[in-house]
Amino acid sequence: MIKVVKGDITKFRAEAIVNAANKYLEHGGGVAYAIAKAAAGDVREYIRISKEAMREQLGKDWIDHGEVVVTPPLQLEKNGVKYVIHTVGPYCGGSWDEDKKSKLKLAILGALKKADELGVKSIAFPAISAGIYGCPLEKVVETFVEVVKEFLPSAKSLREVFLVLYSQEDYEKALKIVGQGGV
């Protein structure tokens, strides 16, 4: 089930939440900063934890499209969050093409696969790359729905996938694509 929700992803109750990170996990702005601040209180501390996890899990200092890094939820655990899954979407700067769509699909799919591997039943995503990375929200939502619909039938544990949008305007745009009751 895919459902669009208006709200703050840092307060959302799901077993895993996805962070739309940059490839160095620096959490300098947008949803990445908000998640880091909510998780650790001190963003620099969450950056340190994230970079350490990246070196342990990937053996390098950056994430490619499709790769993910998992960090503990720390203070987000009070919302039922067990994992924060960091993924990197494409930078669009207002444009959109097949290459950007392909990179976004990899980012979404990587997070879905990791969540399923971890045995979670619910996951919340922000609109990856639609914020400061400048990808058109409608294209991001369409791609998100396409990837999730392809993935869910084969999922072992994952049952609920939420797209959490902060602004009313973004929520309404996404709702037009996904529909009131979800997919």
Swiss-Prot record:
Pfam families on file: Macro (PF01661)
SUPFAM superfamilies xref list: Macro domain-like (SSF52949)
InterPro entries: Macro_dom (IPR002589), Macro_dom-like (IPR043472)
Domain named Macro: residues: 1-182
Disulphide bridges, residue numbers: none
UniProt xrefs under NCBIfam families: PRK00431.1-3 (NF001662)
Protein name as it appears in the record: Uncharacterized protein PF1536
Organism: Pyrococcus furiosus (strain ATCC 43587 / DSM 3638 / JCM 8422 / Vc1)
